[in-house]
Amino acid sequence: MSRAKVYGLLMALAVLFTAGLCACSAQPHAAAETAPQTIVVGIDVFDPYSYLDRDGQFAGIDVELATEAFSRLGYTPEFRMISWPDKNDLLSDGMIDCIWSCFSMNGRETKYQWAGPYMYSRQVVAVRAGSDIQSLSDLAGKRIGVQATTKAESLFLGEISSLLPEVKQVNSFETTEDMLAALRKGYVDAVAGHEALVARWTNQDESSYRVLDESPYSSELGVAFAKGTHADLAAQLTQTLEDMKQDGTI
């Protein structure tokens, strides 16, 4: 074999070897590009929507829906327990990417970048079993317990138009546990909140509490991003949630 042919063969082998190295080095990079992105989801203790189970793991309706929806979009949700009154500061400071915790869209349509609605919820009122309160009109002059910065608080403070009577006092609590404890101990005459939350609690002790038949308000639940951010993701998430309704996931 001539020297020229040997040289040509060596050059061809060198090109193939170099190409192989480039392909090998590119594979991890490609894998990294397709790896799920992490998105930080702020949630509150709001059983049965979001809470910590006995093993300290995040659980609940919203946790399951968020995990499935973001997975379909190529994201891995990182759930972060937050203080509900601090939610807006955490969102604007970038400590969380979104709020997904039985959050009502109604009356807040222009305050956030929304995805949804994905579910509907009624506000209800619960009282002690022996209470003389039988209807919403009987709440006149009574002491009401609500969780701070919730739709129920806005309703009873008169920030939202409703047929509720004027009450004696609105007591706002940081957590639902504190709110429910206040009713149990007689510090308030009634409490108000999302139907699923109140029903889950009263069903555990039906002999001690009951829920009024009338509902003061119905609302749409959505996922809130900071206003002016994540517009594309919010639109994609809205479509994904709609797909989940159609396929029976929701």
Explain the meaning of each model-derived region.
Residues V63-R72, I133, S137-D138, K142-R143, ...:
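Extended ligand-binding regions for polar small-molecule ligands
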Residues L52, A66-Y75, A152-F173, T202-E206:
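Ligand-binding cleft/hinge of the Venus flytrap
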Residues T67, T76-D138, Y209-S215:
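Acidic, polar ligand-binding/catalytic clefts
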Residues A31-C102, S172, Q236:
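Extracytoplasmic small-molecule ligand-binding "clamshell" domains
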Residues S25-P28:
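Bacterial signal peptide processing site
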Residues D89, S101-K111, L155-G158, A182-S218:
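A ligand-binding cleft/hinge motif common to bilobed small-molecule-binding domains
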Residues A19-A23:
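C-terminal motif of bacterial Sec signal peptides marking the signal peptidase cleavage site
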